[in-house]
Swiss-Prot record:
Positions of the DNA-binding region: 55-74
CDD domains attached to this UniProt entry: WHTH_GntR
Pfam family, one: FCD
Gene expressing this chain: nanR
Keyword DNA-binding in annotation: yes
Function: Transcriptional repressor that controls expression of the genes required for the catabolism of sialic acids.
NCBIfam families: PRK03837.1
Record-level Gene Ontology MF annotations: DNA binding; DNA-binding transcription factor activity
InterPro entries referenced in this protein's UniProt entry, alphabetically: GntR_C (IPR011711), TF_FadR/GntR_C (IPR008920), Tscrpt_reg_HTH_GntR (IPR000524), Tscrpt_reg_NanR (IPR023730), WH-like_DNA-bd_sf (IPR036388), WH_DNA-bd_sf (IPR036390)
Identification of the protein by name: HTH-type transcriptional repressor NanR
Keywords recorded for this protein, A-Z: DNA-binding, Repressor, Transcription, Transcription regulation
Organism in which the protein naturally occurs: Cronobacter sakazakii (strain ATCC BAA-894) (Enterobacter sakazakii)
Classification via HAMAP family: HTH_NanR
Length: 260
């Protein structure tokens, strides 16, 4: 586009109006320091466990003030790339599965707030946990089955207390996610349930009692199928359970909207 062309000027004015004449934001010094240090870490210029240069050395190297260096290190800590202890230099670390998933949290919550977002995440959960119960039916050890049985018993004891039942429900599914021994599965599962629970509507306790009893009976069916080492039956029981849960929350949500 020729900036001196009259048509270009008209187009530029139109674009300016649509964007509200918002200027492009300049990067902060701390962001530039963060990006450069991140690239150095990813290029293995600093090994895992190795301390980074001191704050004073980083200030001199990047020609920035202490606040910019500290903000950059704090951002790297949030990404799991460094560990920071009081009085010590930051050390390079490897991001955990939890750190990786937490980076997606903001985007996930935004997606959940859009129409159909919860349904898409419920479908993701169904596909994910379907694989978990099939694996459990085929591979779970006696010790893992014992933990699953214990989680089921706590589930039963919590039927009269909705807050406690929700915690025991989450714990039951968490034990399922632990069985493959994959930390990424665990991180995904914890985050997925956190996102879904936060997005669900608040419902009066009285309306959840029947739902809790149904969920508990469905948990029993899942555990029975796993004990029988029948992955197909375990999968069917899991799908019955999660489809029922989703239908219940949809109905309760619609009921709440109709009262407004």
């Amino acid at each position: 586009m020729n900036p001196f062309d009259s048509q270009s000027e008209d187009a530029s004015d139109a674009i300016g109006r649509s964007l509200g004449r918002r200027p492009l934001a300049r990067k902060k010094l701390s962001e530039m320091v963060e990006e450069e240090l991140e690239q150095m870490i990813r290029r293995r210029e600093f090994a895992e466990g190795e301390p980074l240069p001191s704050e004073r050395e980083l200030m001199a190297f990047f020609n920035v003030g202490r606040p910019s260096v500290r903000e950059a290190l704090a951002a790297l800590k949030r990404k799991g790339l460094v560990q920071i202890s009081n009085g010590e230099r930051a050390r390079v670390s490897r991001p955990s599965a939890d750190t990786i998933i937490s980076e997606l949290s903001g985007m996930a919550k935004d997606f959940l707030s859009h129409p159909g977002g919860i349904a898409h995440f419920e479908q993701l959960r169904l596909f994910f946990e379907s694989s978990l119960v099939r694996y459990a039916a085929e591979k779970a050890t006696d010790e893992q089955l014992e933990r699953l049985t214990k989680a089921l018993d706590i589930n039963r004891q919590s039927l009269a207390d909705n807050a406690q039942f929700i915690r025991s429900d989450v714990e039951f599914h968490r034990v399922l996610a632990e069985i493959p021994g994959n930390p990424i599965f665990m991180a995904i599962h914890v985050a997925l349930l956190d996102w879904l629970i936060a997005a669900r509507p608040a419902v009066p306790d009285a309306e959840l009692i029947e739902h809790n009893n149904i969920s508990y009976q469905q948990h029993i069916a899942i555990v029975d199928a796993i004990r029988k080492r029948d992955p197909d039956e375990a999968d069917r029981a899991l799908q019955t359970h999660l489809n029922s849960v989703f239908a219940t929350w949809q109905a309760l949500s619609q009921k709440k909207k109709s009262r407004k």
